[in-house]
């Protein structure tokens, strides 16, 4: 069934630019975009329905390409500790941080994890998100990682959004493997990943390359195991120190390397050559009160696509608004509003391997878009909060109206 969506303007995000169409018309056919362009150039046709968007601005549906939205408990107590001067690394060394969330997640039932995740994802979806990634990594044993990934699959079935699942079993060292990181990585590679892949629970594989997590050599073992299973990889890299994990990610044609505050010019060059997306996470930077900025100019010089994500997690970025991350990416990291919007649409789609179907308003792609009550696209990165979406459309069907 063809529908004609009219009386609007569009920022299509073709090629990562605004690519604005004034007085636009968008035609959908079933779940897909059939045509988009100026009203004056609309081809003749019959339409089952004509929808008046009342002068709204259209953008692609927003994509949150890095979240840890499934977890037990919360870490508001650690938030207080950090404000008193205790560092993230000190909290982790004392058994807090990821380890405390692992305990709570292992204890939670699948139904409890599902209910709590739905509650925290609802604000993101009402904010215009139509696709997102959710990582495991708070189970750190086969049963608990499988539990998390089953919840993620169920969220994909229940939510009006595309949900990609990423196995992050190499997130931290579980207590039962204390002092035996190599043994745990072996367990991840030979037992956890193959079992989860066999169950069809994994779309991609991630790891945390950092002094307080896993070394580049250990991460490479995970990447090799993922490659043998036919799974793409991504990496938490260069958040707290420089281990050149982003160069390692590029060597394995990773979908993305994320955080990147301590990446070097050499790392940026490698990522640009490999086509690996840089996922910027300003929420974690802000909450940890970091001072070292990702090298945005180096990423620009080497043509690295930059995505922006919420990093929704209980410890370092309890962020429930992707639009707030747009403002932070501009204000803290000095992205332009155009770069930031591309970062939560086309480049975020690339970071999830979804660019063929998501991320821009083009014929043949899914009709996932948002109608905003704004006067120009830069407002999406300008306003701090507020209910801007007028309508959220997924697969040409309205899923939210403001």
UniProtKB/Swiss-Prot annotation:
Cellular location(s): Cytoplasm
Question: Where do the annotations place N-formimidoyl-L-glutamate binding?
Answer: 138, 313, 315
Q: What is its EC number?
A: 3.5.2.7
Residues that hold Fe(3+) according to the record: 66, 68, 236, 311
Q: Which organism is it from?
A: Pseudomonas paraeruginosa (strain DSM 24068 / PA7)
Cofactor or coenzyme needed:
Zn(2+); Fe(3+)
Mind naming one GO cellular-component term on file for this protein? cytoplasm
Q: What is this protein called?
A: Imidazolonepropionase
Q: Which UniProt keywords apply?
A: Cytoplasm, Histidine metabolism, Hydrolase, Iron, Metal-binding, Zinc
Where on this chain does Zn(2+) bind? Answer: 66, 68, 236, 311
- Cite a single GO BP annotation: L-histidine catabolic process to glutamate and formamide
Q: Which InterPro entries match?
A: Amidohydro-rel (IPR006680), HutI (IPR005920), Metal-dep_hydrolase_composite (IPR011059), Metal_Hydrolase (IPR032466)
Quote the pathway field.
Amino-acid degradation; L-histidine degradation into L-glutamate; N-formimidoyl-L-glutamate from L-histidine: step 3/3
Gene symbol of the encoding locus: hutI
- Quickly give the catalysed reaction: 4-imidazolone-5-propanoate + H2O = N-formimidoyl-L-glutamate
């Amino acid at each position: 069934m063809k529908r004609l969506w009219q009386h609007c303007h569009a920022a299509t995000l073709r090629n990562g630019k605004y690519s604005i169409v004034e007085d636009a018309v968008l035609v959908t056919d079933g779940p897909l975009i059939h045509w988009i362009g100026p009203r004056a150039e609309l081809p003749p046709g019959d339409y089952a329905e004509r929808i008046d968007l009342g002068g709204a601005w259209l953008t692609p549906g927003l994509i949150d390409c890095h979240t840890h939205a499934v977890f037990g408990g919360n870490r508001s107590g650690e938030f207080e500790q950090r404000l008193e001067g205790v560092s993230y690394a000190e909290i982790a060394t004392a058994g807090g941080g990821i380890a405390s969330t692992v305990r709570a997640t292992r204890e939670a039932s699948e139904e409890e994890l599902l209910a709590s995740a739905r509650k925290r994802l609802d604000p993101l979806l009402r904010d215009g998100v139509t696709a997102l990634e959710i990582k495991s990594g708070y189970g750190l044993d086969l049963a608990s990682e499988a539990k998390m990934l089953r919840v993620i699959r169920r969220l994909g079935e229940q939510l009006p959004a595309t949900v990609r699942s990423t196995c992050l079993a190499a997130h931290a060292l579980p207590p039962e493997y204390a002092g035996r990181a190599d043994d745990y990585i072996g367990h991840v590679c030979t037992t956890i990943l193959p079992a989860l892949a066999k169950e069809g629970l994994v779309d991609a594989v991630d790891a945390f390359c950092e002094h307080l997590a896993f070394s580049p050599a250990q991460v490479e073992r995970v990447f090799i195991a993922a490659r043998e299973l036919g799974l793409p990889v991504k990496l938490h890299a260069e958040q707290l120190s420089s281990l050149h994990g982003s160069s390692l990610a590029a060597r394995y044609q990773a979908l993305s390397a994320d955080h990147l505050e301590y990446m070097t010019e050499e790392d940026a060059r490698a990522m640009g050559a490999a086509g690996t997306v840089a996922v910027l996470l300003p929420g974690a930077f802000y909450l940890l009160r970091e001072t070292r900025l990702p090298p945005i100019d180096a990423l620009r010089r080497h043509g690295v696509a930059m995505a922006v994500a919420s990093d929704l997690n209980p410890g370092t970025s309890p962020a429930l608004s992707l639009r707030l991350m747009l403002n932070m990416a501009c204000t803290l990291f000095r992205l332009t509003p155009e770069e930031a919007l591309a970062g939560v649409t086309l480049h975020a789609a690339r970071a999830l391997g979804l660019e063929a179907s998501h991320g821009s308003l083009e014929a043949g792609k899914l009709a996932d878009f948002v109608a905003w009550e704004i006067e120009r696209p830069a407002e999406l990165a300008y306003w701090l909060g507020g209910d801007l979406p007028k309508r959220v459309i997924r697969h040409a069907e309205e899923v939210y109206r403001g």
